[in-house]
């Protein structure tokens, strides 16, 4: 059944998949199209997933959000396309290395099929170099704003725009 639901309800619809406290590692990327080759990489990856808790979320972008100019807000990637979110989860802390390696290896195998952009909310803490991709054409402007309003980088516990970095 398809129906309109309030945003808070939609935003919690998959909470049951994410047990509180369960270790996990995410990687995500935009794709202009989901080619047969990319789908093949995903099928192979999930055939060798380290646990049965690993997930793939595919989000469709575009529609009404695509009518906003890329420079109107900090978020520029409004054109149609897909965002894939690889989620590796495990219950035994001893499986951490394998879970993280699986997500990274799968992400690397998908690289030839990815668009050159990233979704800010899904960047893991170790993906500093992709922050520029996440903000795209707005990155240099955001660095200047950060230098002006947060030169000491007080607000850095996020997908950080470092004011000390050259724009």
Annotate the PLM regions.
Residues 1-167:
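Soluble FAD-dependent oxygen oxidases
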């Amino acid at each position: 059944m398809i129906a309109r639901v309030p945003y808070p309800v939609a935003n919690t619809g998959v909470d049951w998949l994410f047990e509180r406290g369960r270790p996990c590692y995410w990687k995500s990327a935009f794709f202009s199209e989901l080619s047969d080759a990319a789908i093949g990489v995903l099928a192979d990856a999930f055939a060798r997933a380290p646990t049965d808790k690993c997930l793939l979320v595919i989000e469709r972008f575009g529609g009404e959000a695509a009518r906003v100019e890329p420079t109107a807000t900090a978020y520029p990637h409004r054109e149609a396309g897909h965002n894939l979110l690889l989620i590796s989860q495990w219950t035994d802390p001893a499986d951490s290395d394998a879970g993280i390696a699986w997500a990274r290896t799968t992400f690397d195998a998908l690289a030839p099929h990815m668009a050159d952009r990233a979704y800010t909310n899904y960047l893991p803490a170790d993906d500093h170099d992709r922050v520029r991709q996440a903000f795209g054409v707005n990155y240099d402007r955001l660095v200047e704003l950060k230098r002006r309003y947060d030169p000491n980088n007080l607000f850095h516990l996020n997908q950080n725009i470092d004011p000390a970095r050259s724009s």
